[in-house]
Amino acid sequence: GGQLPLFQVAGSKGKQPFKIEIKEVPDTDRDGAINLDDVKYLLKHDKNTATPLKGSGDFRSDECIELLKQADIVVTNPPFSLFREYLAQLMEYKKKFLILGDQNNITKKDIFKFIRENRVWLGYDNGGTKWFQVPDDYDITTESRKKIENGVKYFSMGRILWFTNLETT
């Protein structure tokens, strides 16, 4: 597997990590929701930028911590093996966030503590399967967890939830 390119980032070299700064979020196709087509549009216009990072992209690096300090809201899919450490960092810097994680995280003492204190909760879920686009060579052995639509391969990761501290209605 590997990182799937959403778009080309000027100045990037191969699989180099990049940052995205979004300062304006219009619904460009006017369908009532922000989707990948809207994001592609956003990133190709002056008020929104995607630029390569200087370092490795490790969330613990000085460069990434400086970016975190500037962020109003963090939306990401952190490394699942480092989820606890990543969430602790978001809490330390008092950031608003919407992040993906394995449902088993709610059983971890250091994460459940935030849930019990109402500082973190589970985000909205569509009650169905979440499909993630994967590279063509990504091996999926269970047929029910794989689908191909319009030539694009997707994988279902059944235990994935949204974790957030954003107010919802």
Where are these regions (language model features)?
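Class I S-adenosyl-L-methionine-dependent methyltransferase catalytic core
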Residues: G1-V75, P79-T169
